[in-house]
């Protein structure tokens, strides 16, 4: 590593946010020390020492930049030279309208890029407690599984209890163990996505009787017991365990991950399934499939017993069973400033899921902007924030000031959030007419509004890049 010691940016945690942050700092010509505690100290969810390991789904969700907020975030990150998006694009697997990746190939690509960069040094070992006082420019991206000593140190520094919720992991099945005389390949509404062909999911149909028996088994199944300190931790609604969804009502799953719409069983095309379980490709070879929406806290034996009652999965062999881990995040609007710095100690900047964003892409995007801010600090410059009209700017706004504490005071009023168009400022003038001059009606208005917001976001981001950002050539 070259460059003066005082200019080094320390990034703690090499998940998606930390990896992206380190990449952006180095790409701007500033040296980086990237700290990762694995494999010296593992977490309850990680299984490798690879950087940017995906511990939950392998999906980056929609890649549609014109109509979907997360697809727009993909596009913005690509414009900013995101390593995470580059690795995802290079390791994509078919997934209908979504961008899904081979998790091992993805992690390997990120690890290699960071290892090979001359301005990045990777230090393996835990940072126990706050970073040393002489580290003047630090990005803390330790994620939802932050080790206890560091979490305790942050809590003491801020005099604020970290918030927490549970995040559950879906099981992965070996493709060859799925009975394709019962199941079939099809994407919902035959939608074609990145690297896909419109038949990217494996579908397992259920009759009404099978569905009702399955729901009853989920509710009755033996669950993982909570530790005493975990009993009051809420779930994030975007990653609810399937048995918790089942407990909310007998029809909940049929209107959620098991909805039977947009699919036709080629084995029995005249019979409409009452519910359908979908599996999504999990690796590039197509040998592993994860059960979509089936994150769970059922005990391992119960998972195998209950999930093998699904038609087509009677002989399923599991590469990984579902699990549960505790996620922690900060009350960011109160604790962080507009550039993600800790108000109580501005040398510390936070990034990723612990800031209160939810999702792989969102975490990486906050790492991206944190890296740009830190690089500017190292050069003695101040970087203007991305426009609020962009996906990056709107997510940053939610984290650092988008929540009005006085409306709903209390320790749990700020909650994790996926990127969505509801975080964007309203359009000054929403479209009302089609290109041919006829009036937009019903859902057409919603579609046109999203497309207008996306177009404005990309135009404003391009102007911001040109006006405020020095994009160094990737090493």
Swiss-Prot record:
Catalytic reactions of this protein: uridine(54) in tRNA + (6R)-5,10-methylene-5,6,7,8-tetrahydrofolate + NADH + H(+) = 5-methyluridine(54) in tRNA + (6S)-5,6,7,8-tetrahydrofolate + NAD(+); uridine(54) in tRNA + (6R)-5,10-methylene-5,6,7,8-tetrahydrofolate + NADPH + H(+) = 5-methyluridine(54) in tRNA + (6S)-5,6,7,8-tetrahydrofolate + NADP(+)
PROSITE patterns for this protein: GIDA_2 (PS01281)
Cofactor(s) of this protein: FAD
GO cellular component: cytosol
Segments traversing the membrane: none
Residue sites binding FAD per the record: 13-18
Keywords, in A-Z order: Cytoplasm, FAD, Flavoprotein, Methyltransferase, NAD, NADP, Transferase, tRNA processing
One GO molecular-function entry: flavin adenine dinucleotide binding
Residue ranges of coiled coil: none
Example GO biological process: tRNA methylation
EC numbers, comma separated: 2.1.1.74
Subcellular location: Cytoplasm
Keyword Transmembrane helix appears in the UniProt entry: no
The protein's role, per its UniProt record: Catalyzes the folate-dependent formation of 5-methyl-uridine at position 54 (M-5-U54) in all tRNAs.
Family as reported in the entry's similarity comment: Belongs to the MnmG family. TrmFO subfamily.
Protein name stated in the entry: Methylenetetrahydrofolate--tRNA-(uracil-5-)-methyltransferase TrmFO
């Amino acid at each position: 590593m070259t460059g003066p010691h005082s200019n080094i940016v320390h990034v703690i945690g090499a998940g998606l946010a930390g990896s992206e942050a380190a990449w952006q700092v180095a790409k701007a010509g500033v040296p980086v020390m990237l700290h990762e505690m694995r494999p010296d100290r593992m977490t309850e969810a990680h299984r490798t020492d690879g950087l940017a390991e995906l511990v939950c789904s392998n999906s980056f969700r929609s890649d549609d930049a014109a109509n979907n907020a997360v697809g727009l975030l993909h596009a913005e990150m690509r414009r900013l030279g995101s390593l995470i998006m580059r690795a995802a694009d290079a390791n994509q697997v078919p997934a209908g309208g979504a961008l899904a990746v081979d998790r091992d190939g993805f992690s390997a690509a990120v690890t290699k890029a960071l290892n090979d960069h001359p301005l990045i040094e990777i230090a393996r070992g835990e940072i126990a407690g706050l970073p040393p006082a002489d580290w003047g420019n630090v990005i803390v991206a330790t994620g939802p599984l932050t080790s206890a000593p560091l979490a305790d140190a942050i809590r003491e520094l801020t005099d604020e209890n970290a918030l927490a919720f549970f995040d559950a992991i879906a099981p992965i099945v070996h493709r060859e163990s799925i009975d394709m005389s019962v199941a079939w390949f099809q994407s919902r509404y035959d939608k074609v996505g990145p690297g896909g062909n419109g038949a990217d999911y494996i579908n397992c149909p259920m009759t009404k009787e099978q569905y009702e028996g399955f729901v009853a088994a989920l509710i009755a199944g033996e669950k993982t017991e909570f530790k005493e300190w975990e009993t009051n931790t809420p779930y994030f609604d975007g990653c609810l365990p399937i048995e918790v969804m089942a407990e909310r009502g007998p029809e909940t799953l049929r209107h959620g991950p098991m909805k039977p719409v947009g699919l036709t069983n080629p084995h029995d095309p005249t019979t409409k399934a009452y519910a359908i379980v979908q599996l999504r490709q999990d690796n590039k070879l197509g040998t592993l499939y994860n059960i979509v929406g089936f994150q769970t806290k059922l005990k391992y034996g119960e998972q195998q017993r209950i999930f093998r009652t699904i038609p087509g999965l009677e002989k399923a062999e599991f590469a990984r069973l579902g699990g549960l881990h505790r996620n922690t995040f900060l009350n960011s609007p109160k604790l962080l400033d507009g550039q993600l710095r800790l108000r109580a100690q501005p040398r510390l900047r936070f990034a990723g899921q612990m800031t209160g964003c939810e999702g792989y892409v969102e975490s990486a995007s906050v790492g991206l902007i944190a890296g740009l801010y830190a690089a500017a600090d190292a050069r003695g410059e101040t970087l203007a924030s991305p426009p609020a009209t962009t996906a990056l700017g709107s997510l940053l706004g939610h984290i650092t000031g988008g929540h009005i504490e006085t409306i709903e005071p209390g320790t749990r009023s700020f909650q994790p959030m996926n990127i969505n168009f509801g975080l964007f400022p309203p359009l000054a003038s929403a479209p009302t007419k089609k290109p041919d001059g006829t009036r937009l009606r019903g859902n057409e208005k919603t579609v046109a509004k999203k497309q207008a917001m996306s177009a404005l976001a990309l135009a404003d981001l391009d102007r911001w890049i040109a006006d405020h950002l020095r994009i160094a050539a990737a090493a």
